[in-house]
Design a protein with these regions (language model features):
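Hydrophobic alpha-helical transmembrane segments
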Residues: 15-66, 233-238, 252-273, 314-317
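Membrane-interface junctions at transmembrane-helix termini in multi-pass inner-membrane proteins
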Residues: 1-17, 203-234, 274-276
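Interhelical loop/hinge segments that connect adjacent transmembrane helices in multipass membrane
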Residues: 39-45, 57-101, 144-157, 278-289, ...
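Interfacial transmembrane-helix starts/ends
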Residues: 84, 121, 153-168, 172-180, ...
Length: 346
């Protein structure tokens, strides 16, 4: 799947993901009826099987790259030891990141109740609206940025433009979700009612992670994978301390606030360390001004019900974003209009 991403074969990537889900559903449903007392084992086996099918299909679709017979291209004969040394810190940081993402739920289990965990989980479900933007962007950005660095190592406008565009998109979606959070909750059903006050700070999770994908490029280009461990430990420590203090005081809202702040720290650490090895002027001053404004907006909507101030706060944040990112917003509008015009012509 990684090679598919590197080749920008988005249709093949989507087809493999869909095939993976279809195989999983087709196989798992009958097996669950047959082995009624072994549901966990069935799920593990079927998940492994569907991934193997996806892997085989991907290799077959790219048979020109995967050469198992005859002489292989000397350019593809890589020394695995440097690759292993580069990859190991990512494995460690992934383990720490898993703990980082679970701390809020663990804290709610320890300091709160199962009902609070349920409400918090429902809020996280609504946040999945970001998944479409986040996954689509992350799918293509890293291969594109690495390719651009390989071809034009001194051209940094590409990273600045990518950062500005995804900043505008993610903050716009996040602020809009905060404004209409009560409507989303009502539409989704009674079990989501308690999620309305938790949502505002949870938006910083996908916002900061996705934007940081554009600012962390320096660590990737310079192969400073060990710094990923430092970043993961720093963000995780902040989240542990934050949840330990705020969850006993505020419950679910405290967990959301702590998680949101820790993701801002996560973004900052990624950006600072990346700029240490490969400096890019991301105009962080205006970014943090916008972030502070959205923090204030999220705070109000966490502790107060929807009213005229919620709408006014949204308008202020949108105007502020337009003032600081006007060129990017205008470019985005022109780009969308060009897509619409091209579709009409077809």
């Amino acid at each position: 799947m990684l090679i598919v991403r590197l080749e920008y074969k988005t249709k093949l990537y989507s087809a493999l993901n869909i095939a993976n889900r279809i195989v999983y559903l087709v196989v798992v449903i009958p097996l669950l009826f047959i082995f009624k007392e072994s549901h966990f084992e069935v799920l593990i086996v079927v998940m492994t099987f569907s991934l193997l099918v996806c892997m085989v299909a991907g290799i077959y679709a790219q048979s020109d790259i995967w050469k198992f017979r005859g002489k292989s291209d000397s350019a593809n004969n890589l020394d695995m030891l440097p690759i292993f040394k580069y990859a190991m810190p990512y494995v460690i940081s992934l383990g720490i990141a898993t703990l980082f993402q679970a701390i809020d739920t663990i804290a709610l289990n320890y300091y709160g109740s199962y009902s609070q965990v349920g409400v918090y989980s429902s809020a996280m479900t609504i946040i999945q609206v970001f998944t479409i933007v986040q996954t689509s962007f992350n799918l293509l950005w890293q291969p594109m940025s690495v390719e651009h660095y390989t071809n034009n190592p001194n051209d940094k406008t590409f990273y600045q433009k990518g950062n500005s565009i995804i900043t505008v998109v993610m903050f716009f979606v996040g602020m809009t979700l905060i404004l209409f959070k009560d409507i989303f909750v009502v539409l989704l059903g009674e079990e989501y009612r308690g999620a309305a006050t938790i949502l505002p700070f949870l938006i910083f999770n996908p916002i900061m992670y996705t934007i940081s994908e554009t600012t962390v490029s320096g660590l990737i280009f310079m192969k400073k994978s060990k710094m990923q461990i430092v970043i993961a430990v720093g963000a995780c420590a902040v989240n542990i301390v934050g949840n330990s203090i705020l969850v006993p005081l505020l419950g679910c809202e405290g967990a959301a606030i702590s998680t949101g702040i820790s993701y801002i720290v996560f973004f900052s650490l990624r950006t600072v360390f990346s700029n240490k090895y490969f400096y890019v002027d991301y105009k962080l001053g205006k970014f943090y001004i916008l972030t502070l404004a959205v923090i204030c907006y999220a705070s109000y909507n966490t502790f107060f019900k929807f009213d005229i101030w919620s709408v006014l706060g949204y308008v202020i944040c949108i105007v502020l974003m337009y003032i600081m990112y006007s060129k990017t917003i205008i470019w985005c509008f022109k780009y969308l209009l060009s897509i619409i015009k091209n579709k009409k012509q077809l």
